[in-house]
């Protein structure tokens, strides 16, 4: 073997290079404490002294990280914008009408131009694809994650791929269970129900613990109008529920709103009183627009107004923190939740009804029934009247008793007292001058008229009949009717003269009037009623009653026939006080009377000319006014001392 190549030791100058100086310590130089002076230098500290890796500038790393963050932020905003767009869309939201979503899935724009419905087969085929479509909210993220796990780790049948294990298979199974119960799937199942109404009613009872029929009464027609409505809505999105309370305030006077959550989404129960009456169709359209749900997901009926249980439910729910209540509580809730109405069932008292009718001057049966029924909200006796099965009998009895009391009161009063009694029920803004001017306008001496009018009111025999004659449209009937109305008199008509009872109203009046007497009427008066015109007592036949003897009240007769020109009625001349109205009744350019003849002016007329009519008052009335006690038919309560 040849010798190793290289320089020979000891030849030339190579021997000088092998000399190595060993320095023990140099003066004035401090050795670092980190260095061990006794350790041999083996060269291990020079390992990886040179870095052969790729050098990347620091600025480039920061720029790359910033770019990644910007791209992630942009992607997040794009996804959020897409979700916002699809959230309110009636074609994508599972809380909306999914039938329209099926029609528009292939091409929304083309579907919007269709003039008729598509084939039912295509709709059924699209149900499966609709269930797996991302709706933009809910469990869509879980569904996407499930697909990623299946693609990366194995097949849907549970076989594992590379790096897979039992934990991943378990996660896939859980995601599959969640994915089959998404909000979209649940609403589709709701639409597939054969009896949707029964399903909604069952879900309502499951959530609220009572039947929907316990709170409402049914309207057969969708066009029946009502101000109070109970609305139950299913499948409402939570974002709509947050702002619904504010949106509905503008349309309602009172709202009672409850929100619950279930597998279908948010469920609304609302009692609402609108500002005006609405029917079910109008309410349904408004709720569909505000809640973004179809009409078949709504239950709309009016509330039970006479149910104590329903009223207590709304009252108890309104004071809890589960409800949002705005506005004034309806009166039907207040009426049935007050303690005295809940624990004390008031019995009907006829005397209270009669006293009310007497105080309000109601004598007709129809007026009594209508007005008293309207008091049921504030009067417990009226409420008991409505609950009774004998309302017609009570109304008839009340009217009879009220007329008896009024008739007895009138007969006990003299003419001056009656005029004062009627004046108390009339306003004080009248003027007596139009009546005086109208009398003078007809060419009648006012003093002569007042002399005859005084005897007429005092019912002096042979002076108690006032006859007004003249051409048509001269104001005769207007003048007489206005006076009869003020004094609450009665009117008789000659058309009923063939009846035996046509004079019966004269038995219950302080003044009477026979309007437009024709020649046959004058002949009848001359033949049968001379003593009636005299003001003497006469016999009058009454229906279902025995004959009665009455004194005819002051009687006003208007006629276009002047009996002074006919000699056949000469026996009536001394029994009447006749005045002629020759001039037409004056009207202004607007068709209103120039001389107003109303109750206020007649009151002022009597007050002005009271002394001229020679009405005498008793000393007690002059000093103390009216001393008569107010009529009272309701029995009082006796206060017993202890």
From Swiss-Prot:
Domain SF3 helicase: 444-594
EC number: 5.6.2.4
Cell compartments where the protein resides: Host nucleus
Motif (Nuclear localization signal): 83-85
One of the Pfam families matching this protein, by short name: PPV_E1_N
Keyword Phosphoprotein carried by entry: yes
Keywords for the protein's UniProt record, in alphabetical order: ATP-binding, DNA replication, DNA-binding, Early protein, Helicase, Host nucleus, Hydrolase, Isomerase, Isopeptide bond, Nucleotide-binding, Phosphoprotein, Ubl conjugation
Domain of life: Viruses
GO cellular component: host cell nucleus
Example of a GO biological process term: DNA replication
InterPro entries: Helicase_SF3_DNA-vir, P-loop_NTPase, PPV_DNA_helicase_E1_C, PPV_DNA_helicase_E1_N, PPV_E1_DBD, PPV_E1_DBD_sf, Rep_E1_papillomaV, Znf_lg_T-Ag_D1_dom_sf
Chain segments carrying region DNA-binding region: 179-345
Subunit structure and binding partners: Can form hexamers. Interacts with E2 protein; this interaction increases E1 DNA binding specificity. Interacts with host DNA polymerase subunit POLA2. Interacts with host single stranded DNA-binding protein RPA1. Interacts with host TOP1; this interaction stimulates the enzymatic activity of TOP1.
Role: ATP-dependent DNA 3'-5' helicase required for initiation of viral DNA replication. It forms a complex with the viral E2 protein. The E1-E2 complex binds to the replication origin which contains binding sites for both proteins. During the initial step, a dimer of E1 interacts with a dimer of protein E2 leading to a complex that binds the viral origin of replication with high specificity. Then, a second dimer of E1 displaces the E2 dimer in an ATP-dependent manner to form the E1 tetramer.
Protein name, as recorded: Replication protein E1
Organism: Human papillomavirus type 32
């Amino acid at each position: 073997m040849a010798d190793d190549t290289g320089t020979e030791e000891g030849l030339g100058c190579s021997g000088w290079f092998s000399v190595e100086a060993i320095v023990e310590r140099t003066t004035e130089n401090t050795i670092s404490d980190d260095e061990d002076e006794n350790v041999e230098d083996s060269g291990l500290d020079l390992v990886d002294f040179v870095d052969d890796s790729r050098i990347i500038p620091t600025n480039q790393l920061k720029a790359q990280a910033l770019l990644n963050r910007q791209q992630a932020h942009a992607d997040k905003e794009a996804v959020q914008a897409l979700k916002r767009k699809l959230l309110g869309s009636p074609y994508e939201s599972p809380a909306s009408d999914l039938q329209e979503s099926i029609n528009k899935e292939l091409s929304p724009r083309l579907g919007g131009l269709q003039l008729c419905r598509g084939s039912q087969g295509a709709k059924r085929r699209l149900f499966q694809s609709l269930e797996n479509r991302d709706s933009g909210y809910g469990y869509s993220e879980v569904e996407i994650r499930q697909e990623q796990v299946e693609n990366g780790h194995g097949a849907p049948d549970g076989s594992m791929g590379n790096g897979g294990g039992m934990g991943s298979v378990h996660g896939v199974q859980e995601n599959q269970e969640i994915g089959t119960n998404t909000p979209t799937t649940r609403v589709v199942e709701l639409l597939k129900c054969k009896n949707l109404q029964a399903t909604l009613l069952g879900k309502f009872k499951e959530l609220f613990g009572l039947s929907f029929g316990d709170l409402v009464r049914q309207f057969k027609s969708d066009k029946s109008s009502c101000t109070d409505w109970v609305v139950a809505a299913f499948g409402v999105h939570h974002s709509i529920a947050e702002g619904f309370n504010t949106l509905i305030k503008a349309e309602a006077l009172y709202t009672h709103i409850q929100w619950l959550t279930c597998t279908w989404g948010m469920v609304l129960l609302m009692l609402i009183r609108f500002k005006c009456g609405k029917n079910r169709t109008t309410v349904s359209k408004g709720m569909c627009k505000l809640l973004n749900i179809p009409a078949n997901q709504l239950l709309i009926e009016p509330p039970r107004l006479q149910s104590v249980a329903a009223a207590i439910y709304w009252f108890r729910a309104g004071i809890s923190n589960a409800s949002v209540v705005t506005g004034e509580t309806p009166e039907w809730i207040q009426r049935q939740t007050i303690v005295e109405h809940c624990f004390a069932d008031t019995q009907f008292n006829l005397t209270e009804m009669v006293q009310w009718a007497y105080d309000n001057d109601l004598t007709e049966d129809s007026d009594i029934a209508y007005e008293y029924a309207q008091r049921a909200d504030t009067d417990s006796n009226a409420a008991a009247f409505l609950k009774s099965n004998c309302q017609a009998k009570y109304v008839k009895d009340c009217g009879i008793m009220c007329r008896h009391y009024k008739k007895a009161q009138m007969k006990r009063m003299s003419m001056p007292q009656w005029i004062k009694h009627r004046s108390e029920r009339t306003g004080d803004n009248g003027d007596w001058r139009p009546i005086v001017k109208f009398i003078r306008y007809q060419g009648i001496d006012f003093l002569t008229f007042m002399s005859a009018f005084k005897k007429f009111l005092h019912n002096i025999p042979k002076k108690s009949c006032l006859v007004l004659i003249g051409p048509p449209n001269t104001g005769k009937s207007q003048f007489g009717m206005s006076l009869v109305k003020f004094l609450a008199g009665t009117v008789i008509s000659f058309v009923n003269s063939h009846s035996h009872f046509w004079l019966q109203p004269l038995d219950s009046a302080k003044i009477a009037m026979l309007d437009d007497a024709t020649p046959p009427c004058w002949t009848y008066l001359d033949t049968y009623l001379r003593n009636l015109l005299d003001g003497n007592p006469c016999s009058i036949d009454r229906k279902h009653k025995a004959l009665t003897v009455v004194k005819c009240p002051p009687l006003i007769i208007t006629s276009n026939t002047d009996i002074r020109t006919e000699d056949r009625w000469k026996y009536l001349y001394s029994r009447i006080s006749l005045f002629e109205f020759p001039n037409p009744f004056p009207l202004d350019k607007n068709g209103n009377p120039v001389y107003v003849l109303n109750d206020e002016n007649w009151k002022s007329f009597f007050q002005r000319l009271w002394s001229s009519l020679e009405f005498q008052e008793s000393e007690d009335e002059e000093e103390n006014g009216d001393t008569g006690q107010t009529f009272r038919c309701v029995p009082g309560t006796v206060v017993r001392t202890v």
